[in-house]
Amino acid sequence: MSRERERFEEIGKKIKREADAWPHQMAGIRRPMSGPPGTLNTITPCAACKLLRRRCAQECPFSPYFSPHEPHKFASVHKVFGASNVSKMLMEVPESQRADAANSLVYEANVRLRDPVYGCMGAISALQQQVQALQAELTAVRSEILKYKQREAVATLIVPSNSQVAGFHNSGGVSVIAPPPQRPTTPPQPTTAHPPSPSSCVFSQPTTRDLEYGNIESENNYFG
């Protein structure tokens, strides 16, 4: 019985010592929190450490990218990817690109929570449809521009010819109309020589030589 009593007394003294030391430990923890504002992320736990309920160390990989004022960002990232996977992905990326990587993880996690089936693929397909619609619209606009350019080119060709005609009329020139094309003439058909008919030989008229000869003979005749 004496041994058990001594044991209980030792346990009671130990609990009393821990209870007396607890306020001093809490004071030591709270003192650094009232330090300079430049060490906000090293003293005040970041959103990741606050969610995971752990002390935020100075070399915390989440501290520069997950502010304690926006805890919902790391909450969505932790729910989709997990804290350990996010830490590995941030460590694999160069330090100059870690901020962009963290923002990308936040965006992808939010999209995955809104659309658990497709995730980012739904947003990508919607953007691709918009790109195709804009390309079709751009093609239609380019065809309309080409039509207007062709009309302007035709108009520039017609206007100089009209100005030349107007200048010709103003100068008092006479327009000469070209004669119509001549039709091809048919060659004359050859005429065939017909032999003289007997009637034409019998009833041929006397020539001037026969008349003169008849006058001479009538003068030599003497009717006594």
Curated annotation (Swiss-Prot):
GO terms for cellular component: nucleus. InterPro entries: LOB. Expressed in young shoots, roots, stems, leaves and flowers. GO terms for biological process: positive regulation of gene expression; tracheary element differentiation. Residues 44-145 form the LOB domain. GO terms for molecular function: transcription cis-regulatory region binding. Residues 178-198 have a biased composition (Pro residues). Pfam families: LOB. Signal peptide: none annotated. It comes from the Eukaryota. Residues 171-224 are annotated as: Disordered. Disulfide bonds: none annotated. Belongs to the LOB domain-containing protein family. PANTHER family: LOB DOMAIN-CONTAINING PROTEIN 15 (PTHR31301:SF87), LOB DOMAIN-CONTAINING PROTEIN 4-RELATED (PTHR31301). This is LOB domain-containing protein 15. The gene is LBD15.
